[in-house]
Amino acid sequence: MKNNQRPVIRSTTVIGVIRDGKAALGSDGQMTLGNTVIKHSTRKIRRLYHGKLVAGFAGATADAVTLLDRFEEKLEAYNGKLDRAAVELARDWRTDKYLRRLEAMLAIVSHDKALIISGTGDVIEPEDGIVAIGSGSMYALAAARSLMKHSSLPAKEIVLESLKIAADICIYTNDHIIVEEV
C-alpha cells in the first residue's frame, strides 16, 4: 500500500430474491481491511418502512448507513413508494456534493420489487427479481439463478444457499449469514 492510499475495505455479499410473493435479503458478516479480516459478524441488512422492505449495503459502512438513513427519509416522504423513494435518493446522490463522495451500494427488496441503487446513483430493477451486490455478488447471483430455475425452494432458502456458495468461493465473504424475509 502506498502512503497516499487509504486501505481498501472489502466486505460483503448481499443478495435478495423474490419468489411466490415473498422476498428475502441476506448478507454475510465479514469485514476486511486490506488483507486482514477485522470483523466476522457485521450486520449489513436492516428492515425499513415499518418492516415492509429489507435493505442491504456494500461498501464503506459509514457511507452506507448515511445512504440508508436518507433512503428511509425518502420512503417516509413518499409513503413507502419504493420506486419513487429510490429515484429521489439517486437524484440527490448525483447532485449533492457530499453524497457524490459516498462509496456504497444498496440492494432493496419488497414482496414484489427488487432494486439496486448503485454508487453512481443509478436505480436498477433486475428482470429476474434477484439483486446482488458486493465482492461475492456474482457467485451468489449465479447460484440464486440456478436455484430459481432448478428448484422449488422458497426465497429465504435460495438466499441462504446462495450466500453459502459465495462464502465457499469468495475470500471476502464468510458464512456468518443473516437473512430477513418480507
From Swiss-Prot:
Locations listed in the record: Cytoplasm
GO biological process terms held by the UniProt record: proteolysis involved in protein catabolic process
UniProt activity-regulation remark: Allosterically activated by HslU binding.
GO (cellular component) term, any one: proteasome core complex
Keyword vocabulary terms for this entry: Allosteric enzyme, Cytoplasm, Hydrolase, Metal-binding, Protease, Sodium, Threonine protease
UniProt keyword Protease, yes or no: yes
Binding site for Na(+): A167, C170, T173
E.C. code: 3.4.25.2
Active site: T12
Residues of the signal peptide: none
Keyword Hydrolase attached: yes
Catalysed reactions listed for this entry: ATP-dependent cleavage of peptide bonds with broad specificity
InterPro entries found in the cross-reference section: ATP-dep_Prtase_HsIV_su, Ntn_hydrolases_N, Proteasome_sua/b, Proteasome_suB-type
Recorded GO MF terms: metal ion binding; threonine-type endopeptidase activity
Enzyme kind, highest EC tier: hydrolase
Disulfides per UniProt: none
Record note on quaternary structure: A double ring-shaped homohexamer of HslV is capped on each side by a ring-shaped HslU homohexamer. The assembly of the HslU/HslV complex is dependent on binding of ATP.
Function of the molecule: Protease subunit of a proteasome-like degradation complex believed to be a general protein degrading machinery.
Cross-referenced PANTHER family: ATP-DEPENDENT PROTEASE SUBUNIT HSLV, METALLOPROTEASE TLDD
Protein name per the record: ATP-dependent protease subunit HslV
